[in-house]
Amino acid sequence: MKLIIVSGRSGSGKSTALHVLEDLGFYCIDNLPIGLLFPLTREAATQEAPGRLKKMAVSIDARNLSAELANFETIYQQLKQTGVELEIIFLDADEQSLLQRFHATRRKHPLSDDKTSLREAITNEKQLLEPLSKLADLYVNTTGLSMYELRDMIKQRVAGRKDQELALLFQSFGFKHGVPVDSDYVFDVRCLPNPYWDTSLRKHTGVDQPVIDFLEREPLTRQMVDDLTGFLNTWLPSFADSNRSYMTISIGCTGGQHRSVYVCEQLGRYFRDNYRNVQVRHTELPHLQARGEI
């Protein structure tokens, strides 16, 4: 049987992720106590009609006892020894985003009380869930994602991946906005010529032909793309051979509008020839569009 554990801090999008998995045919259980993981998998294995419980997804959060959370790695290893195909999806967002989401919904944080502020509860929750986050197969940073964008990302990364197949996400970002925390690899392409300084290109992005033409006139651009594809061609198979399910490769330039977008598009196009589940995401473009800058 396949078991996906969904975890993450409150407000990060666990319920949305679980709903997506339910739509994908998983039998879903919300807020399962860790102590019930073994009984659940045993029950699923003894079902006379096992098809219904062949794919299961459960969410685990900080409402579990702290001792059980601290002991999660032992339980995780024991579950894997039983032959369960186990995968962990961990969702998180930056502290400011979590604060804003709680203020917007006016929900009470499960760890807050008369002596613990919302900010303190969010910080404490991160520490409690560290045993799960460090074992995550897929770490999703939901900062800046709408509910619909999160649904699409989970659906594409989980549903589009065949068993034992490596799923790739190439994402562009701007260093001035911070490095995405869900990155497995981070590459800096700020050494490439910057189209921003050509005033005719400031409203364009790395997917627009004028910017593509500008960058491809420079031999350094082709060399950068070739070197990155060569490096990833060498090492991605090793990650796949070690049963890695997901890889997030982040490409950064100054603002996340021109150079990083172009390089991500080139890498995505190249690796789609060898990997069936390849996504390209441009983290800054929706924000630039919302501000009328592109």
Swiss-Prot record:
Function of the protein: Displays ATPase and GTPase activities.
GO molecular function: ATP binding; GTP binding
UniProt KW Zinc keyword: no
Protein name: Nucleotide-binding protein Maqu_2718
Organism lineage string: Bacteria, Pseudomonadati, Pseudomonadota, Gammaproteobacteria, Pseudomonadales
Keyword ATP-binding annotated: yes
UniProt family annotation: Belongs to the RapZ-like family.
Amino acids binding GTP: 61-64
Stretches of the chain forming a coiled coil according to its record: none
SUPFAM superfamilies: P-loop containing nucleoside triphosphate hydrolases
Residues binding ATP, per UniProt: 8-15
Naturally occurring in which organism (per UniProt): Marinobacter nauticus (strain ATCC 700491 / DSM 11845 / VT8)
Keywords (A to Z) from UniProt: ATP-binding, GTP-binding, Nucleotide-binding
